[in-house]
Amino acid sequence: MNKFLIIDGLNLVRRIYAAIPDENDMDSLTERVSVACTKLLRIHHPTHVTIVWDGDEMSWRKQLYPDYKKGRKPMPEPLAAGLPALQEHLKSVQIQSIYAAAEADDVIATLAMKTAKAQGEAVIVSTDKGFSQLNHPRISQWDHFNQQYLNITELEQKLGVDRSQFLDLLALAGDSGNKIPGIAGIGPKSAAELLRTFRTLAALFSSLPNLGAKQAKKLAEGRDMARLSYKLAQLQIDLPLNINLKDFRVNGPATTPQLD
């Protein structure tokens, strides 16, 4: 069975870079990233590996909602300047890059889902909990910095909803880290309570007459924003990839299928 290790490039590299005392020391960054990747390979024993990078194009989410991820700090100039050399180094040690046009998340999600549907196993290396919406038994998520898999049961308990409701929760309460708005006046706690009662957004919005007037008014006025927020939070899992798995094989090429 194929086991694909999919590394969220900037999620890994920026965290490592932030811990380097001298922001201009790209040699230290390259060394630390190499050590991290070697450790990942040793722990997970994948048949295939790639590291996926964000691109420079404006994402479809930003076009849809200009405030998406507004206020995020830009990449430090030394890191931006040193990234191509780091990517070349990783290539020299058989860790091939995939370059997304805009956000890496959709490419990672698509690659993981296509791998799982082809009866393979996908391990996503990222601290981004947005990947938890990929509800498939052959997809897991590894937190390199805490050296553990994302525990979905703990996350469900923390959020107060089932995994199948994660996107509905974001649609209602939003996500401040990514500037996904949600519905004004509906926080994570009240959103979770509503979803525990009504289970789905559709059932909730069809039951507004059963709610108190104040809350029903908030929900009715925020319905369009909830739809927008759901769309912004939802990962794309059907992008055309047009890659051949043999290019990402660990320890040399082998005859393996193409992922469209």
Curated annotation (Swiss-Prot):
K(+) binds at residues 172-173, 181, 183, 186. Signal peptide: none annotated. Transmembrane segments: none annotated. Mg(2+) binds at residue 105. Residues 164-254 form the 5'-3' exonuclease domain. CDD domains: H3TH_53EXO, PIN_53EXO. One of its GO terms (biological process) is DNA replication, Okazaki fragment processing. This is Flap endonuclease Xni. The gene is xni.
